[in-house]
Amino acid sequence: FINLEEDKLHTEVPKILGSCKDGVIVPHPGPFTFTATRVPVSDGHTASITLGLEKTPDLDQVKELIEGYRGRAQELSLPQALEQPLVYRPEIDRPQPLLDRDRDNKMAVSIGRVRPADAFENGMGIIAVGHNHGRGTYGNAVLITELLVKEGLVG
């Protein structure tokens, strides 16, 4: 159990998936559900994600989208930005925190077990693993700083 972690997810994920209008974050309406658990792994977060989509997903296309994803950090060639921040793992037993969390200097997120999900009409499930410090707190702080400098928002 991680005290307040699930509450934090219910607050933060809709903001992350939302939009910005007139300088104000408009949270995505969801629906969302989260469970946070503590496991005996020193580093690495695992997310089991199930989505309901507007139409039946083409899983091969989803895999291509994962492999081809490039964000603003890649567009601007920020110094600490990976060329490929998301890595698709085709193995049936991957990703796993102990095996995948340190990928690409702890900055990559490994995604696998892309599959249909019956929980929703047009459902899809994935498993994602990232390093909670390298890709999380420390790595994101560095990327955000690089972005602010590159965009001329700080000197």
Model-derived features with residue positions:
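NAD(P)-dependent Rossmann-like dehydrogenase/reductase catalytic/cofactor-binding core
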Residues: 103-155
